[in-house]
Each structure stands twice: as structure tokens, then as C-alpha cells.
């Protein structure tokens, strides 16, 4: 069994953190008992179509009879399936000032046996010191210290921005729950709960006033969201979205719509033209590269004017050397390796061919 005492200043997000744990328990199919006014259809992980949400709303300031009426939270020995009991504003009815209240001890005794009944407990209170000392020593297994990021200030940077702009540096509204093992602020940190919480604001009554009048806040079990909202909800199929689209189009200014469509058409035209220009430019660049390569290859194939320098034959092997005007020697075997075809008619008549290039070579040059 886990018992958490959630503490924090006013507006620090204590109830929000507890409601997030309630949502987690309901999503797993567990049982929840609480003195909070919940709006089950606004839980994102539950939704308005859930048919089996087991929630019990007990009195604002519960007595032993209220706690006994919720029964067992888990019938198995698997503690991960325990139910969750959430009690808010414990500082008004579970505080150290009312230590002489005769109904206090039976409630503490029940909480001590909550593990055997299959319940995890979350007490919500402004400060752990406000809690009854006997209950604090016996039950405060984990203490959660809640903080809000948007109420903090970044050192140096926040001060500079405040001086320059006249306002605080806006930080995101993120809620932190630092879980300590024990009621000492220096105890070991065992977990950290982080929530933005914006999707849970509508899931509970943030302005709920707790009273001891049982006629105003009697115990009851709320119906599952399907029977209060889901069964009356409009089915969100394709027809629904088409109808909503038509309604929004009618509500919007026709001149604005026409301007939007004209702007969209102009943007599409500019994009099409830019793509066509880009493709044309790429085509021109490719053609220029091809022409340069072909000219380079063609110039590389042209040989200077040659004349036969020597001719030798041994059996079927014929070797011919050529020379140009600068007396540079070219061997027939080297020309063949470079891709030229050497046709030898006789010792004074040789033809060199490569693609469209042809040169007739004789002994006179």
C-alpha cells in the first residue's frame, strides 16, 4: 500500500496532481473514492463513452461510517490493482488542533488498516505540520511537495528582463510533484510527478467549498460518463464533419474566403512557375555539360599530323612507329590501347580510325 501526503502552497497544483492520479487509476479500471466533485466526462483518458467508471463520492469531511461504506478497493493480493482514496482539504478536519475529537481515532485506525482493504490513500493538505501528529507519524509514508514553474524566476536573466520590460519572464505553467520517502524535506527523493495539467482543469470543480453539512454534500456514486453524456452525444462521423464545415464556412466572411482562395491560387501559380523555371535551368545546365564533355572527348581523339617512322614484322606480329612534326614518337600498340584502330595496308600506308576521326598516314607524312 502507498500513502501520499500532497502538500504545497495555495494554487501550487495539489488537487491537480491528485486528479491526475485519479485519472491514472480509472484508466486501469480501478476504484476511486474521493470527497472531490469530479466531472468524469472531462477526463481525457476516460472520455464520455466510458461505461464502467467506479467512483464513490464520500462526504466532504468523512467519518468512520463513510470510510466503512466504501468497502474494499481490491479483492486480490496484487497491490497494483488497489483502489485510490483521495481526501482533499485535510487541514480543515484532520489537523492537529482537533486532537481531542473522539471521532478522530477510529478514522486513523481505519487508515492504518486501509492496506488490508485494498486502498491507496492521498491526503491533500497545505503543509505536513498541519496534519495530526499521530496520523502524520503513522501514515505519512510519502510526502509530495508541489511546485509551479510559472511562479519561479530564473536568476539574473529574470531580473534583467524585469528591469528592461517591467514584467516577469513568462515561464510555462508546469506542475512538479517531488515525492519524498518520509515527512522530512531532506528525505530521499523517490519519484517526480510532472504535469502540464491543462487537459484536467475541466475534470474537477476548482472552486469547491468543503463543508461539514452532510445534507449539502451527502455520499453518492456518480453514473458513468456514457449514461450522462455519451449516450446524448452526436456521433462524429464523416457527415458530422461535413456539416460542421458548412456551418463554419457560412459563419466566415465571404470576402475573406475569396481573398484566401485567390492568395492560394497565386501561391500555387508561383510555385508551379518556379518549378518549371528550375527544371528548365537544370536542363540547360545538363546540355551544356554534355556539349563540353563531347567537345573535350572529340579534341582528345584528334592526333597531330603523323608520318611513318619505322615498320617491322615478325611472323604475324607487325609493329609501326609514327612521329609528328616535333619528332614525338607514337607506337601502334599504345594507340590501340587508347582506343584507336590501326589498319596497316603495307609498310608505307597506314590508316588510324577512332569514331569519326580518320587519318591516312604514309612514309612521306
Swiss-Prot record:
Domain of life of the source: Viruses
Keyword Membrane among UniProt keywords: yes
Entry's localization field: Host membrane
Residues that coordinate or bind ATP: 8-15
GO molecular function, one term: ATP binding
Membrane topology: Single-pass membrane protein
Pfam families xref list: Zot
InterPro entries: P-loop_NTPase, Zot_N
The protein's name in its UniProt record: Gene 1 protein
Amino acid at each position: 500500500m502507498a500513502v501520499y501526503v500532497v502538500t504545497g502552497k495555495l494554487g501550487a497544483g495539489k488537487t491537480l496532481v491528485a486528479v491526475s492520479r485519479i485519472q491514472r487509476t480509472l484508466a486501469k479500471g480501478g476504484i476511486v473514492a474521493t470527497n472531490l466533485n469530479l466531472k468524469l466526462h472531462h477526463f481525457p483518458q476516460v472520455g464520455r463513452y466510458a461505461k464502467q467508471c467506479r467512483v464513490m463520492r464520500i462526504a466532504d469531511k468523512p467519518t468512520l461510517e463513510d470510510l466503512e461504506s466504501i468497502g474494499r478497493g481490491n479483492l486480490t493480493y496484487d497491490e497494483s490493482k488497489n483502489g485510490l482514496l483521495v481526501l482533499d482539504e485535510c487541514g480543515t478536519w484532520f489537523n492537529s488542533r482537533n486532537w481531542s475529537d473522539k471521532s478522530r481515532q477510529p478514522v486513523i485506525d481505519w487508515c492504518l488498516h486501509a492496506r488490508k482493504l485494498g486502498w491507496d490513500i492521498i491526503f491533500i493538505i497545505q503543509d505536513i505540520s498541519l496534519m495530526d501528529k499521530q496520523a502524520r507519524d503513522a501514515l505519512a509514508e510519502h510526502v509530495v511537495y508541489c511546485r509551479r514553474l510559472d511562479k519561479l524566476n530564473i536568476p539574473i536573466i529574470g531580473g534583467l528582463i524585469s528591469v528592461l520590460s517591467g514584467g516577469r519572464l513568462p515561464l510555462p505553467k508546469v506542475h512538479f510533484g517531488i515525492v519524498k520517502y518520509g515527512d522530512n524535506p531532506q528525505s530521499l527523493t523517490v519519484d517526480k510527478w510532472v504535469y502540464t495539467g491543462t487537459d484536467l482543469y475541466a475534470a474537477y470543480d476548482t472552486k469547491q467549498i468543503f463543508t461539514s453539512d452532510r445534507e449539502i454534500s451527502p455520499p453518492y456514486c456518480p453514473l458513468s460518463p456514457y449514461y450522462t453524456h455519451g449516450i446524448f452525444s452526436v456521433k462524429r462521423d464523416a457527415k458530422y464533419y461535413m456539416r460542421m464545415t458548412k456551418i463554419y464556412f457560412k459563419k466566415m466572411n465571404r470576402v475573406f474566403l475569396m481573398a484566401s482562395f485567390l492568395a492560394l491560387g497565386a501561391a500555387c501559380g508561383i510555385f508551379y512557375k518556379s518549378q518549371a523555371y528550375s527544371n528548365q535551368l537544370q536542363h540547360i545546365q545538363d546540355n551544356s555539360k554534355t556539349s563540353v564533355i563531347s567537345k573535350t572527348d572529340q579534341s582528345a581523339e584528334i592526333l597531330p599530323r603523323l608520318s611513318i617512322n619505322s615498320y617491322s614484322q615478325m611472323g604475324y606480329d607487325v609493329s609501326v612507329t609514327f612521329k609528328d612534326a616535333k619528332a614525338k614518337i607514337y607506337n601502334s600498340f599504345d594507340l590501340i590501347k587508347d582506343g584507336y584502330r590501326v589498319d596497316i595496308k603495307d609498310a608505307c600506308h597506314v590508316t588510324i580510325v577512332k569514331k569519326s576521326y580518320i587519318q591516312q598516314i604514309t612514309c612521306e607524312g
